[in-house]
A protein has these predicted regions:
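C-terminal beta-strand-loop-alpha-helix "lid" module of Rossmann-like NAD(P)-dependent dehydrogenases
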Residues: 1-171
Length: 173
């Protein structure tokens, strides 16, 4: 998926594509494709910490806010279940408000939620509240992606070890 995504942006030129690989293998893949990683985040993949995730998220948000980049895309393994880890590509910035609205519209408790939405007085204002909370939500998203990817890696390793153990027990001697 990394290669496919890089092909989508190939018209921009390699020097205009900034990659922040998390993990040793991803960093090696980025280098092999001829790109220069924008930092080393190898340890973050093994033991994700909120502090490191916060720093990475702040850096990505600053690049976007400063118009250094026009979008940020996250590619990671989403842990669906022990037997299923899905490689996921997700737009991080700019926020896709239409997609968020669709998710809310599809929520099974939408009617029940709507009755509560009109009962709140927000101070100082909705805009200020969103401006305060949005960076925190974006930082939490990076941390969640790191945790998700870490869980996927552990699940894949466990399945591989179980399969190898089964092969040991079933091989003819």
């Amino acid at each position: 998926m990394l290669e496919h995504t890089l092909e989508e942006y190939s018209t921009l030129g390699k020097e205009n594509i900034l990659l922040y690989p998390v993990g040793k293998k991803v960093e090696e893949a980025v280098r092999k494709l001829g790109y220069t990683p924008q930092g080393s985040y190898q340890d973050m993949a093994d033991k994700p910490s909120y502090t490191e995730a916060y720093q990475l998220a702040e850096q990505l948000m600053a690049l976007y806010a400063g118009k250094t980049v026009d979008r940020v895309v996250l590619i990671y393994h989403h842990f669906k279940s022990m037997g299923s880890q899905v490689l996921t590509k997700e737009n991080y910035l700019p926020l896709d408000l239409e997609q968020m609205a669709m998710q809310v519209a599809m929520h099974p408790d939408k009617k029940e939620m709507a009755s509560y939405n009109n009962d709140y007085i927000v101070e100082p204002s909705v805009g200020e509240l969103i401006a305060e909370l949005l960076p925190k939500v974006l930082c939490q998203k990076v941390f969640t992606v790191l945790q998700d990817s870490n869980a996927s890696e552990h699940a894949a390793r466990m399945l591989a070890m179980q399969a190898a153990t089964c092969l040991l027990y079933t091989s003819p001697s």
